[in-house]
């Protein structure tokens, strides 16, 4: 395979308490790709970052309703609903209460040591959300968290925009999106629990996405032992 792309000026960045990577095969489109990257990150932050008190999802969670929801919010809502349906409810945006009960109530970098786990309520599923699309009005009976699907959508959107000009790889927090033109070599993605490893398993991908997020890095201590950010909605 052609590994050269991984050596040509990748941009490494941090956002939402996670690391990220942007590789652009054609250097002349690097500035365009960086602009697209930060534009979509800012749009996602304004729409669905529950740690941003001014975001639309924070307003919805705080007030139980959201009026005049943006097109971006509906875009992320559609992605969350799609993930919910595809996983038969295992990827459930109504686990926000459970995440908070286990200590993930603030951005990962600010989770305190020794969290005391609170009691949790059953998740509600997508039925918790009522949407009037024509009026862009939503109500919810419980807090929502689109984190499981939002950053995956962000990397997909960035890759789709940049792919009109260059082969590209975008990664945020282990969610990877790639695109290549006809005849190009695939992107080679290494998957390792604790960062780059020479002997890590590798996946060759021409176009599409790979989810590599796990429970090994984003962990914290609680009175019930180590906790992580992946919640099973059947048990909380």
What are these regions (language model features)?
Residues 1-235:
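Mature catalytic core of soluble alpha/beta enzymes
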